[in-house]
């Protein structure tokens, strides 16, 4: 069933930043939504200019959605993060304003894990340096300090969806796997959990990072941690740019303490492709530098585009909030011959009583409610004749944030 919405679909505006996959654009357009797609991220002032009449904002990892932006987004219904992380969005402020944030936590896990396997082999065989030499007309065939990865130990810091999938691939290549995570996680295959990060660093030939961007992970790998690693070992980071202290990594590579590194993320990254990017790690020996491409495969981006756009479409069309990272997750089957009312309110004592006092005056055919931290979210199906009056009464409640007649 596709009921007529109280707000015409062709009036709903979607703003997509950072080159969101065409699959998402098509999915939105098939719903009749207006879609504007921009290939790069935008600075705060430019987003504020555009967001005043935008209903859905889509982005990847570079765009920052701040309190200031959200305060200007008067019509914003939802935010879609077409990536794993959501730390680029002020989730608390979005929650306060009744704006759910959706993401895709699993779709690019395989792509990132495959990249790490590729880089482990490339580093172990010094393929990057050999390729550069050949392009510079230098033929150097040697086996010194080039090794198989079979029998080597991979240490994984962060054993979530990427880390655990990587452990399976690494074992299939003949590697032993150690892992460390602040949460106790069951091992896959023959991987072994370390009691602390120091133990992992001391016993790994390759150390790879798969942690979120939090206060605790900023500068997680610094001089002390790098010095704890085995001499001749390798460090790989495809998680977040601020996790590794770049100057100390560069020193360890130039001194020979580390035999190589692969870095895909950086403390500061350009908002779009450019030709003048600089980093201390440039010219370091046996060092792979890639421009944040861990999840940049056609397969991953298409899957992410479809998943996040589908979650947003479901929210706009039915109010279902499944998959939101900052919102109560509820859904209600569509009921014929009714109007659907959505209400987002402050999660305070007495609010539900006030809402139910209003609803009790009318014929309510179905209702569902859930709360999360600061807010509560209710979906109610009511007689069509009463929907406007109910909306007016609920909207006037002091703790009501948003009330919408969906259809």
From Swiss-Prot:
Signal sequence range: none
Keywords: Amino-acid biosynthesis, NAD, Oxidoreductase, Serine biosynthesis
GO biological process: L-serine biosynthetic process; serine family amino acid biosynthetic process
One function term, GO molecular function aspect: NAD binding
Superkingdom of source: Eukaryota
InterPro entries according to UniProt: ACT-like_dom_sf, ACT_dom, AHAS_small-like_ACT, D-iso_2-hydroxyacid_DH_PdxB, D-isomer_2_OHA_DH_cat_dom, D-isomer_DH_CS, D-isomer_DH_CS1, D-isomer_DH_NAD-bd
Domain ACT as annotated: residue spans: 340-407
Stored Pfam families: 2-Hacid_dh, 2-Hacid_dh_C, ACT_AHAS_ss
Transmembrane segments: none
Family: Belongs to the D-isomer specific 2-hydroxyacid dehydrogenase family.
Protein purpose: Catalyzes the reversible oxidation of 3-phospho-D-glycerate to 3-phosphonooxypyruvate, the first step of the phosphorylated L-serine biosynthesis pathway. Also catalyzes the reversible oxidation of 2-hydroxyglutarate to 2-oxoglutarate.
Official protein name in the record: D-3-phosphoglycerate dehydrogenase
Organism phylogeny: Eukaryota, Amoebozoa, Evosea, Eumycetozoa, Dictyostelia
Name of the coding gene: serA
């Amino acid at each position: 069933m596709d009921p007529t919405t109280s707000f015409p679909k062709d009036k709903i505006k979607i703003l997509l930043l950072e080159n969101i996959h065409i699959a998402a654009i098509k999915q939105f357009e098939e719903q009749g939504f207006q879609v504007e797609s921009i290939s790069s991220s935008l600075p705060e002032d430019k987003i504020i200019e555009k967001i005043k009449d935008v209903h859905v904002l889509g982005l990847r990892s570079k765009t920052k959605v701040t309190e200031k932006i959200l305060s200007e987004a008067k019509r914003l219904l939802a935010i879609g993060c077409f990536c794993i992380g959501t730390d680029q969005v002020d989730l608390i402020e979005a929650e306060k304003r009744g704006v759910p944030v959706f993401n895709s936590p699993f779709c690019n896990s395989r792509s990132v894990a495959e990249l790490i396997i590729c880089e482990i082999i490339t580093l172990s065989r010094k393929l990057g340096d050999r390729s550069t030499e050949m392009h510079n007309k230098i033929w150097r065939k040697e086996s010194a300090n080039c090794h198989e990865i079979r029998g080597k130990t991979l240490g994984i810091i962060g054993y979530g969806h990427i880390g655990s999938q990587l452990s399976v691939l690494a074992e299939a290549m003949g590697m032993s796997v150690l892992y460390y995570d602040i949460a106790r996680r069951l091992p896959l295959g023959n991987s072994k959990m370390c009691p602390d990060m120091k133990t992992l660093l001391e016993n790994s030939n390759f150390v790879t990072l798969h942690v979120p961007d939090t206060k605790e992970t900023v500068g997680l790998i610094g001089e002390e941690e790098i010095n704890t690693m085995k001499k001749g070992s390798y460090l790989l980071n495809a998680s977040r740019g601020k996790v590794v202290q770049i100057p100390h990594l560069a020193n360890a590579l130039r001194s020979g303490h580390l035999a190589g590194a692969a870095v895909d993320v950086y403390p500061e990254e350009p908002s779009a492709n450019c030709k003048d990017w600089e980093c201390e790690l440039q010219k370091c020996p046996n060092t792979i530098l890639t421009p944040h491409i861990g999840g940049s495969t056609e397969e991953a981006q298409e899957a992410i585009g479809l998943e996040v756009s589908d979650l947003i479409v479901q929210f706009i069309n039915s109010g279902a909030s499944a998959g939101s990272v900052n919102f109560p997750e509820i859904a209600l089957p569509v009921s014929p011959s009714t109007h659907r009312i959505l209400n987002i309110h402050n999660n305070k004592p007495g609010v539900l009583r006030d809402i139910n006092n209003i609803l009790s005056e009318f014929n309510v055919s179905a209702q569902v409610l859930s709360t999360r931290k600061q807010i509560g979210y209710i979906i109610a199906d009511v007689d069509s004749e009463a929907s406007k009056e109910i909306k007016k009464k609920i909207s006037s409640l002091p703790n009501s944030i948003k009330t919408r007649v969906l259809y």
